[in-house]
Curated annotation (Swiss-Prot):
Name of the protein described by the UniProt record: Large ribosomal subunit protein bL32c
Species lineage: Eukaryota, Rhodophyta, Bangiophyceae, Bangiales, Bangiaceae
Subcellular location(s) per record: Plastid, Chloroplast
Species the sequence originates in: Pyropia yezoensis
Disordered as annotated region, ranges: 1-26
GO molecular function: structural constituent of ribosome
SUPFAM superfamilies, A to Z: Zn-binding ribosomal proteins (SSF57829)
Gene Ontology CC terms, in alphabetical order: chloroplast; large ribosomal subunit
Pfam families from the UniProt entry: Ribosomal_L32p
Record's compositionally biased regions (Basic residues): 1-19
Amino acid sequence: MAVPKKRTSKAKKNARKANWKNQAKTEAQRALSLAKSVLTRKSNGFIYNLTEASDTFSD
């Protein structure tokens, strides 16, 4: 017969939730930073075709 496990304490639940939220915050900051660097063309991780890119941004 299946027996329910012991309940997780509030402290453990809150610690896991805080860890999860902190990881999400870090990823959001990285994504925003990457987006800003791409928009200002200061990123080194991407190769731009400057002839096509200048046409799209000149509008």
